[in-house]
């Protein structure tokens, strides 16, 4: 996304219509301005925010008029709002929420000033959604962009040969394409075929870090449609006009796969040093100039060394892809999951491979020195997809701090996936994630309400890519609406879209081709019509980076000097203003996501427009600034972290996001918050709080809302008291069993529930293996036979018949060797009544449990509850992990293990344990992983040099292993 080239041809001037915006035109003695009032230049939806912004010279209300195709249909008075800090403008608001007319050809006037024309329709943004998605096909690498596919999806704009081009970097030109790209000189001795993927931005580089968040966003758009709205038709096969249309797979998945296959190809092959890591990026070894089509690139290209950040981007997105393609293309899904797990193990072994910045000649850096958030994101995606509890410690021990996201800040990507994707083993994490998103989105509404123009940005947030910061915040608001039904979140999205499409200080639509006065000269090597008529201008739908007070390029710095006191004005529409006017995949991805959400919201027509100048349109938020999503290791309820003895209050500086089915904090009284019922807080005096494991609203804040909202119910009348949900405690464990043809184990399920209102309760439970329900029932307890070695998810729901429910989920690991360890080992967790068996059957089980487990990617030897696994090996090195599993019925508090090598192997570095010694070796728990609950596993790893031959698999000993 970063290009530092010198342009040799002056940029063309803006069209005349923009000149009119800047200098105005004289009508009589008064100077009229076109583009003031500032409106969304595409238009509005009937149930969205419809406030226009008028730049005025004073604070006196003025008369506005709305015409429709020349006929006056409404008028009113502007609402003075005062000076806007980010723009320096004195502004008024114009509220059009009472207008019921729809169609095109609307214009607002104040005195002699007039807006650009706009529409009001529920379909206003349908085409814009497909325009934004089309950006990705146009920027594909390794394929010819053909004329029939250059037009937008579902006819959003017409195809044209001017946007077609030969395949880029595909076995042609001086660099011979991306089919056999070597490593940067002196960094490795192999080459990779990395022909696919998307060109990142104005340059022709392809970056795993920035590509990761981009492909994740498109896949999350799909998962939202799959799991929340059910509206997959919008991105279905045939919707986007791409070469794969008609293959039976959703077009958005075909487009995302083009990038995903590139990212898979960037993984270091097996047998090489740092196998499983991902190369940070691939690009030219020197900067090229503009204009330049991809197939004209004269520069050699090279792979930049692997980084931990890139590797975790691969782990996260490949895990996400694995679950999406599982029922579409099982082979591709398996390939993705294998790559994701390899990447995770490699990142664990190389946690400090931070991009050095020594390879930035020819491409952007994307250096990220803090990768704990990437570890969290990858762990969340892998846990959602696999249910493997080894990823839980990373999730449990990470403190959420950020309120927005971007390529270097990815923790919220993990939170959003946990919130969107349903899985039995993530039930409580999902509840907590949804609450966390609503809390963050509320802070953005507060910021937005303080801005004169409808951007959810403070004056300090107008930096490189500020428009993408807005788009990302709108994603969070959109999900908050999905989870709560609170109209304020949807209206926040609406306001942000209004800003991007023209309701801003510059009266400019920042999306190419969409509006009357739009960005025309984005920084892009191929869409360089501003420099050379042999190259095309940009097609509709590309999002400009937007105002940037940093002014990193020389043209912006010289033309915009003095703008920094009014940072929202620091933008220049010139192809060589790369710090303010570049375009890139990670900016267009959230634009597409937000427009998809907005079209869903527009289609509902369920809520009336709540446009208002009142400050009550923002959702109150607690003052807590950081939080953790922490699942209990012994049950599915999310509990406070062990470092805190009480639930966090709204005034704390750090808090744990928790979820519970506990009863209301305030008895029968509730707050009707714009159609959604919330409990009233007991101790929180103002705004929103967090009490008794759930969100609540203070009485003062709730009572200030207009009718019919506000406080409802009556605590003094039991007949009117709101229903309180039951509580549930679930436990599950496995015991050994042999009899007849059934060998192994019995899974015992026990639920204990109570209801504060004394309601009769009904139970339902199910046992899930992978994605298959292997047993279900409607009792409070059960015992079932299981015959496979694997992890089982046990879920139980209790209902009071009046809408109150409680759900608990727990995880039980079943391994035959745990229940039939052989005569030389002590058998634990086996009931005496089921311990007798025939010698032949027992012998078969002992033989099975004592064998060395092996696969193409790892080998392992069991030692009771301890397992040594080689995760990778190359010429003279290896990585391995030791897993300590608790198969008992009580927690393990502290553990240590020992092992030694007989072939000369040596350990060079380790993670997740205190490893000491020099053969033999000892490892002990760290504070955070010392406690292992029943059925759970602690895992640590290390890297070392091999002795002779293959990496040795030694026995692991220690009291915890027996």
From Swiss-Prot:
SUPFAM superfamilies the UniProt entry points to: Carbohydrate-binding domain, E set domains, PKD domain, Six-hairpin glycosidases, Type X cellulose binding domain, CBDX
Keyword tags: Carbohydrate metabolism, Cellulose degradation, Disulfide bond, Glycosidase, Hydrolase, Polysaccharide degradation, Signal
Enzyme class label: hydrolase
SMART domains reported in the protein's UniProt record: CBD_II, CBM_10
Superkingdom per UniProt: Bacteria
Disordered: annotated segments: 608-651
Domain CBM10 span(s) in chain numbering: 670-699
EC numbers on record: 3.2.1.4
Official protein name in the record: Endoglucanase A
Phylogenetic placement of the source organism: Bacteria, Pseudomonadati, Pseudomonadota, Gammaproteobacteria, Cellvibrionales
